[in-house]
Amino acid sequence: DELGPWGKVNPPLRKRAVADELVAALARGDVDLIGSDHAPHPIEKKEGSAPPSGMPGVSTLLPVLLTLAAQGRISYELIPQVTSKQPAEIYGLKKRGTLSVGDEASLVIVSPNEKWSIKKGDLRCGKCAWSPYSEKPFIGKPEATMLRGRFLFSNEEFYSLKEEGVWLRVS
């Protein structure tokens, strides 16, 4: 309720106690993978009379997980397991999900102790320029992103915004 139309998502956001239990399940290893369900909508649509469900999530997934780790609620080692290794194994994506010789070098470099927050207007990529996490404190900041060995983001700059993805068949 505190987010108003900005928090309209499916399934709906739950009470804090339910979210805390989900974090505890993640910490116990009961959760196989984490995804962002990135569903952004422009400000004008979310402020309209019938706001659509969804919110941006891909840019805040890692900062949320890093903050949980900094707070001691999950381990840092768990983050690449549930965001990379296990999803690649579950979907049969070869040469992905680990950092090994011969694998795709897709990774994020972070400053694990940096305290920061998303300021209004910071989101420069995608179809919406807002975040449900605006002004909320994070601990741990993504500093650079590599895709298949190439930097896409570093030093607060995007090096490429064109489509870089490739179609992957799951096994």
List where the protein language model places each region:
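Electropositive phosphate-/nucleotide-binding environments in soluble metabolic enzymes
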Residues: 3, 12-20, 52-62, 77, ...
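Short acidic, glycine/serine/threonine-rich loops at helix termini
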Residues: 1-2, 44-47, 120-122
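Short beta-alpha connecting loops at secondary-structure transitions
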Residues: 7, 46-51, 128-132
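A generic local structural motif
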Residues: 18-22, 95-96, 131
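C-terminal cap of metal-dependent C-N hydrolases
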Residues: 101-168
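His/Asp/Glu-enriched, well-ordered alpha-helical/loop segment
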Residues: 27-34, 39-112
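Histidine/acidic residue-rich metal-binding segments in metalloenzymes
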Residues: 1-34
